[in-house]
Amino acid sequence: MTRARAFEILELSENATRDQVVDAYTRLMKQVHPDKGGSTYFAKQFNEAREVLLG
């Protein structure tokens, strides 16, 4: 996954700060977490995007 795609998945601009990445990841995971009946596909996408952006 590219950094640009990771920003797109997390609904952020490419100049987002580390804190904004964390906040977006947390917000989105609360919506799609598999333990809450959400999608494992989207959870994996958000996890990968966070890993790409935060290392």
Feature-to-residue mapping (PLM):
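N-terminal J-domain/J-like co-chaperone modules of DnaJ/Hsp40 proteins
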Residues: 1-55
